[in-house]
Regions:
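Short hydrophobic/Thr-rich beta-strand motif most characteristic of the beta2 strand and flanking loop
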Residues: 25-32, 40
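Charged docking surfaces used in two-component/phosphorelay signaling
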Residues: 15-23
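C-terminal output helix
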Residues: 106-116
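Active-site beta3 strand of CheY-like receiver
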Residues: 44-50
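Short, glycine/charged-rich "phosphate-handling" switch motifs in NTP-dependent
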Residues: 99
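Receiver (REC) domain active-site loop signature in two-component systems and cognate sites
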Residues: 55
Length: 121
């Protein structure tokens, strides 16, 4: 089963995302900030990463850029899932290396559909 890394500082958001993804057979791991997300991605080589932006320490933009520039992780698809919904935020996220951008609130069904579409591509 594919492994999905969730990088988000909200335990509630992480719980909802993990529950939805695991219900559909995905394995999940979670990180509470960008630095931990980068470390786990390098160690675990997940099949997909859902990345929040606003987190303490290393934010999601910085973590995405770090992963996109690291040989072992540059091919892992990263989808930003965040409350920052301005067009400039979306463009900046994509320019850092994300392949897609979802604005919260995101329903569990939409999250699972996005994972399925990304991993089957």
């Amino acid at each position: 089963m594919p492994l999905i890394l969730i990088v988000d500082d909200s335990p509630t958001e992480v719980h909802v995302m993990q529950k939805a993804l695991e219900k559909h057979g995905y394995r999940t791991a979670a990180a509470a900030d960008g630095a931990e997300g980068v470390r786990l991605a390098r160690e675990m080589s997940p099949d997909l990463i859902f990345m929040d932006i606003v987190m303490p320490g290393m934010n999601g933009y910085q973590a995405t850029r770090a992963l996109a520039n690291y040989p072992k992780t540059r091919t892992i698809p990263i989808i930003m899932v965040t409350s920052k919904g301005q067009e400039t935020d979306r463009i900046w996220g994509l320019r850092q290396g994300a392949i897609d951008y979802m604005v919260k609130p995101v329903s569990p069904d939409q999250l699972v559909a996005k994972a399925q579409a990304t991993l089957s591509a």
